[in-house]
């Protein structure tokens, strides 16, 4: 009884060898099935060994962390002595005149070639970054009316209000809201060589390269002429020297601009740049952009509006890189305002500061790009079995159809 039950459950019924019928069509179908199965198995093996990147969108919970800013910008018609970089955000935090920390400034001649030392930031002095000083212990430099020095005669030397060097006079002028220009006829600036050197550099360009840390909130960074200063009325720059030098402008080349840690380093470490090529482009879409309008842009403001999306890359070798992708929209306008020359129906507001501005806005969402194998082991085995079974099933059906067709044709011929 038990044996007959097992016999009835046998789904693989056998036939005797001497009653089997073999045909040429069956042989061709069998060969085709073998080749098709091998092709599908090789394809499944390739998918199993392939690496894919699967994106995932989550809420960004790292709002307290700083975001790294990396940039390399060239201004062919702005000397390094006049360019300043400020970063401001909606929290009220300001990083003013930060080019002295974390950045290198390279002077460029009219042909765009480097001039002098890339780290040279001081226009006055003895060539070693120091300025000549007055060694008289009783010397008290004049502030030229920018500060009240009327009571100095009644004060001790250490209590007097003095402007001992050119930078002190310039700071006093900024606090008073006065135009400093090039420091001509100011004794401290003449002594330090500031006046002669800054005028010698007015026909040069500047390449600025470096990095800074910014908050993950809305704000802006801007390159503008002259020293920045802040008062109760807002944020300003001393543009006096820029205003009277008509050959200066903020036409520029963005060699590199990115937010977050660069991922090229990991690409080079793995020796597989092609695998990460798309990601590199997404994190720095403005690289190589050149802005040289065919009109006078002396009093012109160039603006980029960047939408930043925090991004994490998780690699198979357990390396995790936190960076950011961004898209940017470009806009430019004359400070004089009025109708746009290219679009007469567009009106520009009047006012502002000449320069290059990048207004950035952070997304509340984060993209996680995770590297994974194309298939798991279980998926690979399942797909292999499915491929083999499917090919055999189709081959069986085709063999039966061909056999019945042959029998039908032979039967008609025999009649």
Swiss-Prot record:
Give the GO cellular component terms, alphabetically. Answer: COPII-coated ER to Golgi transport vesicle; endoplasmic reticulum; endoplasmic reticulum membrane; Golgi membrane; retrograde transporter complex, Golgi to ER
Q: Where is the signal peptide?
A: none
Q: What is its main location?
A: endoplasmic reticulum
What InterPro entries is this protein classified in? Erv (IPR045888), Erv_C (IPR012936), Erv_N (IPR039542)
**Record bears the keyword Transport:** yes
Residue ranges annotated as transmembrane are 25-45, 377-397
Q: Name one GO biological process term.
A: protein transport
Lipid bilayer topology: Multi-pass membrane protein
Q: Name one Pfam family in it.
A: COPIIcoated_ERV
Spans within the Cytoplasmic topological domain: 1-24, 398-415
Q: How does it assemble?
A: Interacts with ERV41.
Query: What is the designated name of this protein?
Result: ER-derived vesicles protein ERV46
Q: Which gene encodes it?
A: ERV46
């Amino acid at each position: 009884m038990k044996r007959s039950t097992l016999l009835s459950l046998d789904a693989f019924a056998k036939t005797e060898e001497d009653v089997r019928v073999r045909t040429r069509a069956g042989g061709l179908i069998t060969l085709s099935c073998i080749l098709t199965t091998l092709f599908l198995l090789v394809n499944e093996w390739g998918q199993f060994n392939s690496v894919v990147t699967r994106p995932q969108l989550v809420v960004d919970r790292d709002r307290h962390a700083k975001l790294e800013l990396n940039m390399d910008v060239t201004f062919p018609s702005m000397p390094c002595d006049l360019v300043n970089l400020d970063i401001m955000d909606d929290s009220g935090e300001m990083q003013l005149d930060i080019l002295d920390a974390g950045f290198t400034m390279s002077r460029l001649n009219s042909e765009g070639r480097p001039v002098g030392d890339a780290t040279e930031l001081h226009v006055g002095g003895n060539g070693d970054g120091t300025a000549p000083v007055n060694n008289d212990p009783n010397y008290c430099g004049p502030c030229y009316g920018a500060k009240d020095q009327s009571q100095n005669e009644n004060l001790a030397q250490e209590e007097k209000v003095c402007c001992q060097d050119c930078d002190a006079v310039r700071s006093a002028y900024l606090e008073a809201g006065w135009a400093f220009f090039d420091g001509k006829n100011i004794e401290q600036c003449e002594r330090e060589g500031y006046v002669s050197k800054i005028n010698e550099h007015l026909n040069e360009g500047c390449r600025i390269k470096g990095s800074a840390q910014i908050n993950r909130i809305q704000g802006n960074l801007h390159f503008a002429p002259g020293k920045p200063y802040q008062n109760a009325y807002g944020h300003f720059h001393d543009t006096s020297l820029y205003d009277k030098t008509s050959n200066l402008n903020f036409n520029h080349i963005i060699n590199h601009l990115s937010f977050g840690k660069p991922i090229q380093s990991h690409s080079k470490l793995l020796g597989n740049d092609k695998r990460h090529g798309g990601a590199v482009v997404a994190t720095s879409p403005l690289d190589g952009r050149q802005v040289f309008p065919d009109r006078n842009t002396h009093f012109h403001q160039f603006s980029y509006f960047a939408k930043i999306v925090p991004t994490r890359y998780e690699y198979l070798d357990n390396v995790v890189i936190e960076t950011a992708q961004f898209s940017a929209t470009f806009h430019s306008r004359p400070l004089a305002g009025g109708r746009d020359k290219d679009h007469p129906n567009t009106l520009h507001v009047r006012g502002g500061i000449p320069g290059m501005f990048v207004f950035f806005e952070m997304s509340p969402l984060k993209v996680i790009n995770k590297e994974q194998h194309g298939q798991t082991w279980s998926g690979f085995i399942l797909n292999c079995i499915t491929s083999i079974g499917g090919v055999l099933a189709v081959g069986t059906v085709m063999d039966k159809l061909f056999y019945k067709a042959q029998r039908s044709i032979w039967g008609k011929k025999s009649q």
